[in-house]
């Protein structure tokens, strides 16, 4: 892709895309959503091009397109699915011309890179044209801004009330608290997480709209979802955002006229992505490994809800190797957007802080009123795991950035691993 752009900076405009083009963007969940869409379509005999081996920036996507096109620059496949970095939609949408645009969410993410999330919203908004069909989360009041005063067709997905919803606000640092139309404070019939839920404005007509695709039954313990009281499928792991990613893919399947019963079968048979979620045992203790995204408080908050949902005695390990691979910043402002206060009254034996910012994590936990005797700082992963194995109690929860997942698993399973 890089070489092709040097040879011809207009090369993207010379490629002919398939009839159906689906682009997925947002702060998190892009890759998971794309993988589901691609698997559902391929299992039903569709030929699909997907940038799973390239990056989600211009050169990575161009590499994928060039590998899939013929000598005339035509992509003859049935469907093109692209995962696109939210800041690159403005550069790519004008060439890809997606029929469907899935916007998973827009949250506080990578502050040194993005600044305020409003900047991300504005850049995606400018990239949209009126012929693009938007697929959005009905439970997210922020993404509804894309369809206010808009000519775009849109389809919504969401989750109805269930045994996991709650009525009182649990999170302080939120993306949106006020109505985007009249600036009144939004009220909620129920919450799922952060600002996700059944919201309404008391002073104007802004409210959660009825989604076309809605979860009518959700059971994390039995790992299944029922959609529209008709379609049932298993979810590969029991987190809220996995449900949302799956709903987004299921919505696309319905819009491009795939068989939804077959889609349910495909989703139910999807293997767990062990890089995102893992579960195994160590000496009769269950080990949960949750992959979180550094610089994104929302991913940590949904992990904390997962921890809080399980009421048994537990040990936590939290940390990362690098805050960012792309930028040489050690910005930790996002650490104070994570609602660690959810853990203050939970059944916790110890919380082990690891990595180069282990002491910063410990300081944040103290501000969250976690008892000081429960907080342990052990920067090196191998030493931390030895401590967990010998001096802690209860099930084990790894709330880790992706760069600590493999070292943690290797050490827990007794394999050699670097720090």
Residues covered by each model-derived region:
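Adenine nucleotide phosphate-binding catalytic loops in nucleotide-utilizing enzymes
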Residues: 155-298
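Residue-level signal for inorganic ion chemistry
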Residues: 83, 104, 135, 245, ...
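A generic structural signal for short, well-ordered alpha-helical segments in conserved domains
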Residues: 34-39, 250, 362, 409
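Buried hydrophobic packing segments
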Residues: 37, 41, 61-65, 246-256, ...
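Glycine-rich nucleotide phosphate-binding loop and flanking beta-alpha elements
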Residues: 30, 88, 109, 141-142, ...
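ATP-dependent carboxylate-amine ligase
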Residues: 1, 183, 196, 201-205, ...
